[in-house]
């Protein structure tokens, strides 16, 4: 399901048998209609970014709900798929902040310790937030609580009102929070553009004696 260390830590913040409830939910959801991402990618964020390597969290809300977009990493799409509007704006801010990145699959961020997590890990095709409030929030809140317990600093990048509510779980003074409006077209001009989250994250990591992220990779 997830990287084994993640699994053990997350379980400590969940009611007994919650993983069984998740599996039952997934069985029913994927049997009853088209759901994104593909089932093998539901926990991809936790599979490709081990807990011990995680130094940044970028929190999304739920997966893209269009064909072939969602790949289990927040905001990322496969290279052959056109970038959705929020990702276009993320890459625009990255270009203004650090430099241009000519591809929009963010897997290389995940392999550098950037946990690309959605608060809701599945979505019915064509229905944004269609699985919100059903099963996922206690699980992904537990992920944030696990990160909060880390001894090494983590930079939490929270875009938009929904993500910013999760600050309540970030109580460890070792960690850092970068927050701004969401990169969606509706809010990007209200403070997302110009917020420089990428250079700010690297400045924090380097000040903490950690390696910055190669955001252009």
Swiss-Prot record:
One GO molecular-function entry: uracil DNA N-glycosylase activity
Localization in the cell: Cytoplasm
Catalytic activity, EC: 3.2.2.27
PROSITE patterns the record matches: U_DNA_GLYCOSYLASE (PS00130)
Keyword annotations: Cytoplasm, DNA damage, DNA repair, Hydrolase
Pfam families, A to Z: UDG
Keyword NADP: no
SUPFAM superfamilies xrefs: Uracil-DNA glycosylase-like
InterPro entries tied to this protein: UDG_fam1, Ura-DNA_Glyclase_AS, Uracil-DNA_glycosylase-like, Uracil-DNA_glycosylase-like_sf
GO cellular component annotations of the record: cytoplasm
Record function comment: Excises uracil residues from the DNA which can arise as a result of misincorporation of dUMP residues by DNA polymerase or due to deamination of cytosine.
Protein family according to the UniProt entry: Belongs to the uracil-DNA glycosylase (UDG) superfamily. UNG family.
Protein known as: Uracil-DNA glycosylase
Protein source organism: Streptococcus pyogenes serotype M3 (strain ATCC BAA-595 / MGAS315)
Taxonomic placement: Bacteria, Bacillati, Bacillota, Bacilli, Lactobacillales
């Amino acid at each position: 399901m997830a990287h084994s260390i993640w699994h053990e830590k997350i379980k400590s913040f969940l009611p007994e048998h919650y993983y069984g409830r998740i599996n039952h939910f997934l069985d029913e959801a994927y049997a009853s209609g088209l759901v994104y991402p593909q089932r093998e990618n539901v926990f991809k964020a936790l599979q490709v970014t081990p807990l011990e390597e995680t130094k940044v969290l970028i929190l999304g809300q739920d997966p893209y709900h269009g064909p072939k977009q969602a790949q289990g990493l927040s905001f990322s799409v496969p290279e052959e798929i056109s970038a959705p509007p929020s990702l276009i704006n993320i890459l625009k801010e990255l270009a203004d902040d650090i430099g241009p990145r000519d591809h929009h699959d963010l897997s290389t961020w995940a392999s550098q310790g950037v946990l690309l997590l959605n608060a809701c890990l599945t979505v019915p095709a064509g229905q944004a937030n269609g699985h919100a409030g059903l099963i996922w929030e206690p699980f992904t809140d537990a992920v944030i609580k696990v990160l909060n317990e880390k001894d090494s600093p983590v930079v939490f990048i929270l875009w938009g009102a929904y993500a910013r509510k999760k600050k309540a779980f970030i109580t460890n003074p070792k960690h850092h929070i970068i927050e701004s409006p969401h990169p969606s077209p509706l809010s990007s001009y209200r403070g997302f553009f110009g917020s420089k989250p990428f250079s700010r994250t690297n400045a924090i990591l380097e000040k903490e004696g950690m390696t910055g992220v190669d955001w252009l990779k």
